[in-house]
Amino acid sequence: MAVNRTPVLKRCRSLEMDPVYLGIDKKSRRKAKNAGRKVSEYGMQLREKQKAKFIYGVLEKPFRNYYKKAERQKGMTGENLMIMLELRLDNVLFRLGFARTRKEARQIVDHKHVLVNGKCVNIPSYLVKAGDVIEIREKSKSSARYKEILESTNGRLVPEWLEADADALKGSVKSIPTREVIDVPVNEMLIVELYSK
């Protein structure tokens, strides 16, 4: 799988994005190289797409596939796209506070530590549905890793569309989120404009 090895804070600077959206509380004191430079319309559209891909850790081909699915659904394409990205299993694990970052959540899912409705799921891109119950498997719960994770994600707010029981390392999807409650700094309309060309 393709991996972008650019340092995280450097990418955040270039995308003019706060690293807190990735679960990282570091701040860069440097300015982006091109700060203040006028960006073209295409440049702005491309930046929004790169931002969404970077936040959710999705590569170009899967991202394009999400867009095509979003286009076929009823409603607004941009909103459908953001909702689909938000419903990825790795993102839900991150939102529940069972992983410090989405990257760590992907690793936890890959290593078969996660159960969805009692069944092991090791696909980070698995899309959860309303009513799904997500938990860390029993064998893994006693691991020191999860104690550390819960300590560092203790102050993180769980979105209203999810319910988390940190002590049991268990959560559930109460409802499908609306765009208004998805807290990511992405203008999805620019992504739609980019793909509509």
Curated annotation (Swiss-Prot):
GO molecular function, a single term: rRNA binding
SMART domains tied to this protein: Ribosomal_S4, S4
Domain S4 RNA-binding positions: 87-147
Superkingdom in the source lineage: Bacteria
Keywords per UniProt: Ribonucleoprotein, Ribosomal protein, RNA-binding, rRNA-binding
One GO term describing the cellular component: small ribosomal subunit
A family per Pfam: S4
Regions that span the bilayer: none
Gene3D superfamilies: Ribosomal Protein S4 Delta 41, Chain A, domain 1, RNA-binding S4 domain
GO BP, sorted A to Z: ribosomal small subunit biogenesis; translation
Annotated family: Belongs to the universal ribosomal protein uS4 family.
Complex and partners: Part of the 30S ribosomal subunit. Contacts protein S5. The interaction surface between S4 and S5 is involved in control of translational fidelity.
Functional description taken from the UniProt entry: One of the primary rRNA binding proteins, it binds directly to 16S rRNA where it nucleates assembly of the body of the 30S subunit.
Name of this chain's protein: Small ribosomal subunit protein uS4
Organism: Lachnospira eligens (strain ATCC 27750 / DSM 3376 / VPI C15-48 / C15-B4) (Eubacterium eligens)
Gene symbol of the encoding locus: rpsD
